[in-house]
Amino acid sequence: GFLDSFKNAMIGVAKSVGKTALSTLACKIDKSC
């Protein structure tokens, strides 16, 4: 249903935002960028 697809979209957004945040954090910590 609509709510299921909305929930899946939110989860997808959260995952990609989390990955980006983790990459940025790791970059700042170990200066690998």
From Swiss-Prot:
Gene Ontology terms describing biological process: defense response to bacterium
Tissue-specificity statement: Expressed by the skin glands.
Matches recorded under Pfam families: Antimicrobial_2 (PF08023)
InterPro entries to which the protein is assigned, alphabetical: Antimicrobial_frog_2 (IPR012521)
Protein name: Brevinin-2PTe
Presence of the UniProt keyword Signal in the record: no
Family listed: Belongs to the frog skin active peptide (FSAP) family. Brevinin subfamily.
The organism's place on the tree of life at top rank: Eukaryota
Transmembrane segments annotated in the record for this chain: none
Annotated S-S bridges: C27-C33
Any one cellular-component term (Gene Ontology): extracellular region
Keyword presence, Secreted: yes
Its job: Has antibacterial activity against the Gram-positive bacterium S.aureus ATCC 25923 (MIC=36 uM) and the Gram-negative bacterium E.coli ATCC 25726 (MIC=18 uM).
Cellular compartment(s): Secreted
UniProt entry keywords in alphabetical sequence: Amphibian defense peptide, Antibiotic, Antimicrobial, Disulfide bond, Secreted
